[in-house]
Amino acid sequence: MTQLRSHPRLVRKLQDSLGDQLCVALDDATVVEIMLNPDGRLFIERLGHGVVAAGAMTPAAAEVVIGSVAHALQSEADDERPIISGELPIGGHRFEGLLPPIVSGPAFTIRRRASRLIPLDDYVTSKVMTEAQASAIRSAIDSRMNIVISGGTGSGKTTLANAIIAEIVTAAPDDRLVILEDTAEIQCAAENAVSLHTSDTVDMARLLKSTMRLRPDRIIVGEVRDGAALTLLKAWNTGHPGGVTTIHSNTALSALRRLEQLTAEASQQLMQEVIGEAVDLIVSIERSGKGRRVREVIHIEGYRNNHYQTEHYAQIEEDSHVA
């Protein structure tokens, strides 16, 4: 993730280019994402309301926004460098900007960084998960199990991870947490915690190697997305249990297959036994037309006879959803 500069002048320039509407949206805790399409149409996703049209932006104005972000990221935005990725100097929100020729017109998305922590109890009261699922998660935390949260884009993986981390801090306040991320999204109130972030020159695998020298009690990774997954699994297996990570996958079982794919990027050996030993609990969350819900919680009991040994906890009712 490209490092940003947060000089007040750059912040003011970016605020001016975004305009009042988008600045207000970025201050709105219910906003999930702001999207500008190449045709100039704006859309905003809000919790409980889904995606709604929010007006339009001219190509010239969109180019100014992308250029301002690029400047803050100490980069350039032009036809030879048409992709700008990074964190906004306003709030640390995730930004992805695109310019022609890879799109027909300037486009960007802003994934708003969550500002409100949703307690695990709220997931139950709003019927995003069952009481049995919440109990399984709490039991896993108390037993220092490693938890993988799976889901698609926009399913709420990071928000759920923050809720689980808050439970960890409550259950084990003396534990030292080391948190590794590409983008700063994890919220952690632990007194003894260290947050590390990747850069253009330091990748996740390198951060994980450094983490082993930082005396972690629990290792938390914002998202596993490459061969560094193998390094994390080995760390979990060698005296650092009780960790949390997220992974892009639509179901709990497909999360195991995804881990197989990622570990294959770092090793030619099959890693099912390593995965079966390191991963204890998979929490699968999804977003549907009815809202977000925890689809399933699965306990992994190892890998034997060419199969993962699993135990399913109660699934949420089919008609349940979060508002």
From Swiss-Prot:
Predominant subcellular localization, coarse grouping: cytoplasm
ATP-binding as UniProt keyword: yes
Primary gene name: trbB
NCBIfam families hit by this protein: PRK13833.1 (NF010407), TrbB_P (TIGR02782)
Family: Belongs to the GSP E family.
MF annotations from Gene Ontology: ATP binding; ATP hydrolysis activity
Subcellular location field: Cytoplasm
Keywords: ATP-binding, Conjugation, Cytoplasm, Nucleotide-binding, Plasmid, Transport
A Pfam family that the UniProt record links to this protein: T2SSE
Name of the protein described by the UniProt record: Conjugal transfer protein TrbB
A single GO cellular-component term on record: cytoplasm
Binding locations of ATP: G151, G152, T153, G154, S155, G156, K157, T158
